[in-house]
Design a protein with these regions (language model features):
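N-terminal beta1-alpha1-beta2 module of alpha/beta enzyme domains
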Residues: 1-78
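Conserved catalytic cysteine-centered active-site region
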Residues: 79-87
């Protein structure tokens, strides 16, 4: 079985130190892959409440999202053999030459 994990990319846990620690630990412990996502938009007037808060509003900290390509580049610079991937990416918002690398 292969195991992959998501890098801390959104909210309060998305810090430089957390990304480095998780990427290095995953690489050292034999995790197969690290994953990121692409999030461009946030709902202004959601039709359903967010279940992660008492009042149903999306926390401001959750609106901070690291760019997926930048985050993968950062993870690659801090690991040796782990595979990297995107679970979701909006190709129209990224340079095709950069994505092809």
């Amino acid at each position: 079985m292969r195991v992959g994990i998501t890098l801390p990319q959104v909210g309060e846990q998305a810090t430089r130190a957390n990304v480095i620690e998780l990427a290095k630990t995953a690489d050292k412990e034999g995790i197969d892959s690290l994953w990121v996502l692409d999030r461009l938009l946030w709902p202004l007037k959601p039709q359903t409440p967010y279940r992660g808060t008492h009042d149903g509003t999306l926390p401001v900290s959750a609106q901070r999202v690291f760019d997926p390509i930048d985050l993968l580049t950062f993870a690659a610079a801090n690991t040796e053999k782990i595979k990297l991937g995107t679970s979701v990416i909006d190709m129209l918002f990224h340079n095709p030459v950069i994505l092809a690398k």
